[in-house]
A protein has these predicted regions:
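Rossmann-like AdoMet
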Residues: 1-94, 98-139, 154-155
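Short amphipathic alpha-helix with an adjacent loop that forms part of the alpha/beta core around
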Residues: 146-156
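A conserved beta-strand element that flanks and buttresses the S-adenosyl-L-methionine
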Residues: 160-161
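A short, conserved alpha-helix within the catalytic core of class I
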Residues: 168-181
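Conserved beta-strand signature within the Rossmann-like core of class I S-adenosyl-L-methionine
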Residues: 181-197
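Short, glycine-/aromatic-enriched active-site segment of Class I SAM-dependent methyltransferases
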Residues: 201-216
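Short alpha-helix
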Residues: 216-243
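Conserved catalytic loop of SAM-dependent methyltransferase domains
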Residues: 235-261
Length: 282
């Protein structure tokens, strides 16, 4: 590979990938007890981009809490992946809406098959910065175009995961996708983060305004597992844990009591969850 760095322009697809990449590096630095992503740092060394705006914000209290949320999410999903791989050592691990995230690579076993799926323009950038290894397949596809199903080898089990992805999907799109996945991948598992309607409205506030969207209620949220998921996925087992405190108590030196209080509010009032859906075998 060339040592020439990839130049990243503002207001481009590449920039939307670089910002969360910087976030994963930053999470590793300020919350090392719960999250480590050495891959993010290595990828950043290949980039020509002005990170000064992000660096200037990093000591802001709410900015730091936002990255605690990110650290918790990636750690939770990594925990779910490792648990599945323990009982399915040659499983397929599928990162839905991968961007430049390496959660699959960081948590997979040596005998696992890894699939990273995102839009073709995103995969083009990923292939340049993170060339796929022998056990990795990068797929350029809209998640709603289920032709990508045929590229997944689920013969030894499969776990799908998505980090911060489905908030941007319409509820009808999620229903159609999940139903198709349950039918095509019996015995598989899907894990992802979610929140209630109020929280999703807050998270998408800027994006909704920019996109000219007037009815946020059409977008995917989960107020109640039974009413918003299980009712239209009868042949599955749906469960959930708190996003912030369901996998760890955050009683670590880098997390203040105030942040633990905010975490409790997030899991409680905003119903921030990591949802697991097990697709029943036929």
């Amino acid at each position: 590979m060339s040592n020439e760095k990839m130049h990243i322009e503002s207001n481009t697809v590449q920039e939307t990938l670089v910002i969360p990449l910087w976030g994963r590096k930053y999470c590793s630095e300020i919350y090392p007890e719960i999250y480590q992503d050495t891959t993010a740092k290595k990828i950043m060394e290949k980039l020509d981009y002005d990170f000064s705006t992000l660096e200037a914000k990093k000591n802001n209290t709410m900015f730091r809490f936002g990255y605690l949320e990110a650290a918790a999410r990636y750690t939770d999903l990594g925990t779910e992946i490792r648990a599945y791989v323990k009982s399915h050592p040659a499983a397929a691990i599928v990162n839905l809406g991968c961007g430049l995230d390496c959660t699959a690579e960081n948590n997979a076993g040596d005998t696992c098959k890894i699939y990273n799926i995102d839009r073709p323009d995103v995969i083009e950038v990923r292939n340049k910065l993170i060339p796929p290894t022998a056990n990795t397949t990068n797929i350029g596809s809209d998640l709603n175009d289920t032709k990508w199903f045929e590229e997944i080898d689920d013969s030894n089990g499969v776990i799908f995961f998505a980090a911060g992805v489905f908030y941007y999907f319409l509820s009808d799109e999620v229903k159609k996708l999940f139903t198709a996945m349950a039918k095509r991948f019996p015995g598989g598992r899907l894990v992802f983060d979610t929140a209630n309607k109020s929280a999703v409205k807050m998270m998408l506030k800027t994006w909704v305004k920019t996109a000219g969207i007037t009815d946020i209620s059409k977008y995917f949220y989960v107020n109640d597992l039974s009413e918003d998921l299980q009712v239209w996925l009868p042949d599955t087992k749906v469960s959930a844990k708190g996003y912030m405190l369901g996998y760890h108590d955050l009683k670590i030196p880098s997390v203040s009591g105030f942040f633990r209080l905010l975490s409790k509010i997030g899991d409680g009032f905003m119903k921030m969850r990591i949802v697991r859906i097990d697709f029943n075998k036929n």
